[in-house]
Curated annotation (Swiss-Prot):
It is an enzyme of class 2 (transferase). GO terms for molecular function: ATP binding; kinase activity. Its EC number is 2.7.1.-. Keywords: ATP-binding, Kinase, Lipopolysaccharide biosynthesis, Nucleotide-binding, Transferase. This is Lipopolysaccharide core heptose(II) kinase WaaY. The keyword Repressor does not apply. It catalyses: alpha-D-Glc-(1->3)-[L-alpha-D-Hep-(1->7)]-L-alpha-D-Hep-(1->3)-4-O-PO3(2-)-L-alpha-D-Hep-(1->5)-[alpha-Kdo-(2->4)]-alpha-Kdo-(2->6)-lipid A + ATP = alpha-D-Glc-(1->3)-[L-alpha-D-Hep-(1->7)]-4-O-PO3(2-)-L-alpha-D-Hep-(1->3)-4-O-PO3(2-)-L-alpha-D-Hep-(1->5)-[alpha-Kdo-(2->4)]-alpha-Kdo-(2->6)-lipid A + ADP + H(+). Kinase involved in the biosynthesis of the core oligosaccharide region of lipopolysaccharide (LPS). Catalyzes the phosphorylation of the second heptose unit (HepII) of the inner core. Transmembrane segments: none annotated. It holds the Pfam family WaaY. GO terms for biological process: lipopolysaccharide core region biosynthetic process. Belongs to the protein kinase superfamily. RfaY/WaaY family. It comes from Escherichia coli. Pathway: Bacterial outer membrane biogenesis; LPS core biosynthesis.
């Protein structure tokens, strides 16, 4: 269950009504935590592995600096991406699928439905990234395929199933960095085609979503070719 409250000037969404997540957020705002490793550091996104009295977590701050006016207008017609992601992650895991890494809290600075800053606490999954494997073993591919089928059956997406987003842990293969977008047949097909491209897992489902993606891809290539001749 995800609880939603106003807390310290933020819209705060946290797991299982557990006060430890408010404590960790307090420590983060006070800069009272240990950074174990910087995982990403670009202009609008900071991701670190941090150590707290409750253990290690992935700490992420996203503060988009471009297209602010466009993002503000879109916020009135589109849902909140990260709010949807924390709710969907909790729903899927509550249904018994622990394949996705957990999402513990989300804090947003909001004006109406527009958020300018997103602060997140996410499960740290220890293990070996597929990026570090020269060849992906067939049993790992089979496990990923089965788990992705379960994820799609529960109407959730990866959105970007490349090698860097899969970790072989002591408890099996886990997926990180999932999508908060709504789940459609076309987006499921894009997941499957990306797994075929990046992981060598053949797409065996050729449904409406699959043919829609193929048609759109061919159409874009055709238009690009026409523009090149113009």
């Amino acid at each position: 269950m995800i609880t939603s409250i106003r807390y310290r000037g933020f819209s705060f969404y946290y797991k299982d009504n557990d006060n430890k997540y408010k404590e960790i957020f307090d420590e983060i705002l006070a800069y009272n935590f240990k950074t174990v490793k910087v995982l990403r550091n670009i202009d609008d996104t900071k991701v670190s592995l941090i150590d707290t009295k409750y253990g290690r977590y992935v700490f992420k701050v996203f503060a988009p600096k471009t297209k602010r006016n466009e993002r503000f207008l879109k916020s009135f017609v589109k849902g909140d991406y990260y709010q949807n992601l924390i709710v969907e992650t909790d729903r899927v895991r509550s249904a018994g699928l622990t394949f996705p890494n957990d999402f513990y809290f989300l804090a947003e600075r909001k004006i109406f439905n527009y958020a300018s800053v997103f602060i997140m606490l996410i499960e740290y999954v220890e293990g070996v990234e597929l990026n570090d494997m020269p060849i992906i073993p067939e049993n790992v591919k089979a496990e990923i395929k089965a788990s992705m089928e379960k994820l799609h059956a529960l109407n959730m997406l990866s959105g970007d199933p490349h090698r860097g987003n899969f970790i072989v842990s002591k408890d099996g293969v886990r997926i990180i960095d999932l999508s908060g977008k709504s789940c459609t047949a076309e987006r499921k097909a894009r997941d499957r085609l990306a797994m075929e491209r990046h992981l060598g897992i053949a797409n065996e489902i050729k449904d409406y979503g699959y043919y829609s993606v193929i048609y759109r891809t061919k159409l874009r290539k055709f238009i690009k070719k026409l523009k090149g001749k113009a």
